[in-house]
Structures are given as C-alpha cells and as structure tokens.
C-alpha cells in the first residue's frame, strides 16, 4: 500500500510549507482557501491545519476524505468501462458510493428515508443495481471516546452492514456489550433506508463489526479519522486490514499531500 511508505522529501516539503502557512492568526484566517479539489471542493486553512501532528480530524476533513474516495472510484469506473465495455462477457463495474458526514447526522435524527436518499442520490441511482457498496462515516460505539470516527459499509450483494472501528479488537469474544447495543441501533435506524434502496430483498440484513483485523488498535484521542481512512483504503483494495502506528503517521502526511494535489492514488 502506498501510504505504508514514507512520503517523498519534495512532497513533505510541500505539505510542511503549506502547513506553516496555515497557522491560524484569527477566526477569519481559518476561512482562507489553501486549495480547491476538482474545481468544486474548497479546503480552508482551518481544515488543512487539522492534518498537523497529534490533531483530531473534524467533519470538514472527513468530508474531504469522502470526496477524494468518490473521485477515486469514479476514475476507476471510467477507466474500467473504457477498456472493457466492448469485450465479450463484459460485467459492469460495481461501484461504491461515499456519503458525507451529514448522512449519518441526518439518519440518527430520524430524517425520512426517501427524502434522505433523494438528497444523496440522483434519481437514476435510487436503485442500487450499479452499486456494490455504500460507505459512510459514523461515530464510534464508545461514548467515552473524545475522537470518535468509525466507518460503516452497506454491501448490496451480501445484504450486510459492516462496522469498522480502530478501537475494536479482531477477537470476537472480546466485544463489549456497548458494541452489541450499538450494532442493534445501527441496524434499526438504517432499516428504512435499506428497504427503500433494496425493496426486492425483504429478509434480514446482518449488521456486524468487522473482526478480521491485523492492525494495532487506536490508543489515543486524535488519530481515529486517520485510522478510518486507512481502513477505507484497504477495503477499497479488498485487502486484509494491516497497518501499524508508523503507517498511520505516514498516512497523515500522505493525506495532507493528496488533498493538496486533489486526488488519491489508485
């Protein structure tokens, strides 16, 4: 994986230069634009500065991460279609949808499922025939955690909802009761959306915490957003989740660089 390697010196120089210039001197200064991604998403000094050492990532950074992952999936889809669409036995690329943080905020306050789907999907996309996964950030099951990012993934082929958390041990016998309660609540609040998106499937959706993990557990109050980004990258590559704390430190630097250049590597 690319983020397991140390960022190249010139890339480090670019990030550190921008980071130094992003030190905030006033509330107004926080709204100054550091870069614009895809001519659409503006990244402010206040957002970019969160990628500094030992700082917790806020909603603006996590929304930027989701935006970059969606761009990456769109690029893969376009390349796949251009190469394979005329081949015999062609199978369409099963796409992923990466939703912004506001999706989960709206889910937990009970927003009507149909209106919520309409907000995040254009009408032709309501039926998920072309989608395999939907990813969205959630808050960790652990209410005592200050830095609480985790990620959930809806799988429309297997009809499952999986939860990925840097604080969850890979050994299923060590799951705390709070996690079980959280998974029950997750399934309950998502059920109307799942039925709306996939009405032909009326059986039970399985909601579980992913346990095939081979990484060092999160043990601080500022890296959960970076952990979540690492987990998402491995999931997109369909690889076992393996990384250590050094990899997380490198990923924080890499993520800052990718935001500046406006794309994630394939």
Predicted regions and their residues:
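Active-site nucleophile-adjacent alpha helix/oxyanion-hole segment immediately C-terminal to the catalytic cysteine
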Residues: 2-81, 211-266
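Cysteine protease-like catalytic core of ubiquitin/ubiquitin-like
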Residues: 52, 80, 84-266
